[in-house]
């Protein structure tokens, strides 16, 4: 059976270490993406045409350029054009932050603009300043509404992190490929079992997050 491959030597530990690299990339990226995304989302609601143009261009640029292209540009371009040499994990985290910030910013923008205007007008009528209105009324409600989507962004980052293998990151899928290639001639069913285990590992991480996101949505809707 192909499953026995996992218990030969340190194969299982290698897979789990690869999964840890995947989770580490996703966690660090989503943490900073949420922080910068909140700032970006606030800027995207600005009435200043220059700020709106810059943030709009950034969002469209990230959406139009495939993430894989951004990874290649950052990994090979920084070294060639600017003589900046970063390891593949660092490059992957930076690109994911760049991508995630745009996604999170758009989510925050949508949450801010979805808040009823009469709440803002009522706050002003009570003598609350615009800054206080934003901090105590708009921001808490927006973060509450955007939290399920933020969790979904985290799961997307976990799944999308498999692209990191193309710039040399030894994450869980890369480790799986190495095990399969090493065992290809001795066990032809190795790919089925190894990828099956990788699927289960992704499922164990992502499915609880998905359930938690649905729980929050259902609870806050009621």
Where on the chain are the PLM-derived regions?
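Transmembrane alpha-helices and adjacent helix-loop boundaries
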Residues: 1-222
